[in-house]
């Protein structure tokens, strides 16, 4: 466990005219949460005492054991694409197992994430907006960057309190040693170093399907090219590791070429390893935290022999297949007899890759406009379902706003690990245990700040959303939308910013004042692929080329 400073902090929100934070909470929250707490603190404190008694009763019923946590994060799926029988008919994709899972628990109808995969995953892991940690954009090839060692992940928080921790599947938090999951609190990790562009798009099969232009020589070969190393090559694929040890690449031998078949086998292996981890973790006396982040449905090749779905698109096909795989995971939880003491969360990380043609992928924007990389609702509003039988009401839904960072703080609360959350930095995640246990209208957030990379693009407050105006434009002139009346953010109404513009600007000022007080952390930097003991010669050559032009301090 990395060092965690346990300093006592009483946030000086008198600076904002809000008053003092409640004394028993040493976590430094963003200003907007403290603004809400100044209005609801006594009520929330009373609720928390009731919740503590409830959680104590649940632990007593389970022999004193804290709940297991299984967190499943699906890549690039539009809101409504899974978990909804009606919309299954609209899209021609059946997700019966995820639909059933959704009916067995709570549907979070206003779950917000970050606009793309790396930022969302960093937000979950750290409980912080990724702009604070430097993980604010997606990287495809070698970068020599990653999640810094100074960040304290939810795996480290839970591990410090006695949880066993495992990660299987997509990681996408960097290619440097300090950023690997087994160096960020996980006891076991099986993961690819990069992501699906490398694994399913940079292949001959994708070139044959006309999904990739210019990378493979069979689609384009330029005799005038001078730079022979412009196209990424020699990238590490999948690795496995345990905490305290080195990683080993397991997918490719020296000189072997990555293919679509490798990608299929990788997806199938991660499914098997998730089931294996469930069985292994369920044997022990300790509670566990298991992350499963599948690579599918992202798939850039029409590789199925026969369509499973009515839709037939190659993303759609893999989403329907993934639904069956999720069913296997749910069934395994039942077989192991741990269902009543296991919190399972299944959600998407952001909207679909909308700049990739829906005529090929089979996925589309559905209700909300936009998708991956966008601050629009289609980029950051996702399906999210939570199940904990006997604790969370089955068949329930909540319209309360939740942000992916809230899972960090909520998981810590459920695992009696709040004391291990760092208290020397802003934690954006809000404890939403009350919402899970008491249901709709018990959320503690009515706002979201939405960034694209390092730029604040939108602010959500209640049902209203302001697109941050360009410099020099007053708040009263900014586009403001009522998301109930205009969910696609197409018709800003002049009557909204005239009364809300100043309030939105005040929200931004409070947020920026906290950033000034607690500046962003530095992004982790280093030599790519260190800590992997069996690097292929081609990977070593790629690293050497990359390092040849890097500043000396790296």
Cite the ranges covered by each PLM segment.
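Active-site His/acidic residue clusters
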Residues: 79, 204, 254, 269, ...
């Amino acid at each position: 466990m990395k060092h965690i400073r346990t300093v006592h902090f009483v946030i000086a929100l008198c600076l904002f005219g809000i008053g003092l934070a409640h004394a028993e909470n040493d976590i430094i929250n963003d200003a907007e949460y403290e603004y809400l707490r100044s209005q609801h603190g006594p009520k929330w404190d009373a609720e928390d005492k009731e919740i503590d008694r409830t959680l104590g009763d649940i632990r007593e019923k389970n022999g004193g054991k804290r709940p297991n946590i299984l967190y499943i994060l699906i890549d690039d799926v539009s809101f409504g694409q899974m978990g909804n029988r009606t919309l299954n008919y609209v899209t021609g994709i059946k997700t019966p197992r995820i639909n059933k899972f959704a009916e067995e628990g709570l549907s979070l109808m206003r779950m917000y994430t970050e606009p793309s995969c790396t930022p969302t995953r960093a937000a979950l892991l750290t409980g912080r907006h990724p702009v604070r940690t430097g993980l604010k954009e997606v990287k495809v090839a070698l970068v020599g960057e990653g999640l810094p060692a100074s960040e304290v992940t939810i795996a480290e928080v839970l591990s410090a309190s006695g949880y066993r921790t495992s990660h299987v599947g997509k990681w996408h938090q960097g290619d440097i040693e300090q950023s690997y999951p087994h160096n960020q609190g996980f006891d076991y990790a099986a993961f690819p170093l990069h992501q699906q562009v490398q694994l399913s798009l940079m292949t001959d099969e994708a070139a044959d399907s006309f999904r990739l232009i210019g990378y493979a020589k069979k689609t384009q070969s330029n005799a005038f090219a001078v730079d022979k190393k412009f196209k990424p090559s020699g990238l590490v694929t999948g690795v496995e590791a345990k905490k305290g040890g080195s990683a080993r690449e397991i997918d490719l031998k020296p000189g072997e070429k990555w293919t679509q078949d490798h990608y299929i086998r990788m997806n199938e292996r991660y499914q098997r390893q998730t089931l294996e981890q469930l069985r292994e973790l369920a044997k022990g006396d300790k509670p566990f935290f298991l992350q499963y982040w599948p690579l599918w449905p992202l798939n850039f090749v029409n590789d199925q022999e026969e369509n499973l779905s009515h839709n037939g698109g190659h993303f759609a096909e893999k989403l329907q297949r993934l639904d069956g795989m999720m069913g296997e995971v749910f069934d395994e939880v039942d077989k192991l007899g741990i269902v009543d003491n296991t919190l399972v969360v299944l959600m998407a990380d952001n909207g679909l890759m909308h700049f990739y043609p829906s005529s090929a992928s089979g996925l589309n924007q559905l209700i909300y406009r936009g998708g991956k990389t966008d601050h629009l609702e289609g980029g950051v509003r996702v399906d999210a379902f939570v199940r904990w039988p006997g604790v969370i009401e089955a068949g329930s839904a909540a319209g309360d706003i939740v942000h992916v960072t809230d899972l960090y703080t909520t998981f810590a609360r459920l695992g009696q690990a709040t004391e291990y959350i760092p208290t020397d930095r802003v934690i954006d995640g809000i404890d939403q245990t009350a919402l899970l246990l008491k249901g709709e209208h018990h959320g503690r957030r009515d706002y979201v700040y939405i960034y694209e990379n390092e730029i604040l693009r939108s602010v959500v407050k209640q049902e209203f959303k302001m697109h941050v105006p360009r410099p020099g434009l007053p708040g009263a002139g900014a586009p403001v939308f009522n998301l109930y009346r205009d969910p696609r953010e197409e018709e800003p109404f002049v009557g909204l910013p005239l009364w809300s513009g100043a309030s939105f600007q005040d929200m931004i000022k409070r947020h920026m004042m906290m950033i000034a007080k607690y500046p962003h952390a530095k992004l982790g930097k280093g030599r790519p692929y260190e800590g992997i003991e069996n690097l292929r010669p081609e990977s070593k050559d790629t690293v050497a080329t990359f390092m040849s032009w890097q500043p000396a301090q790296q």
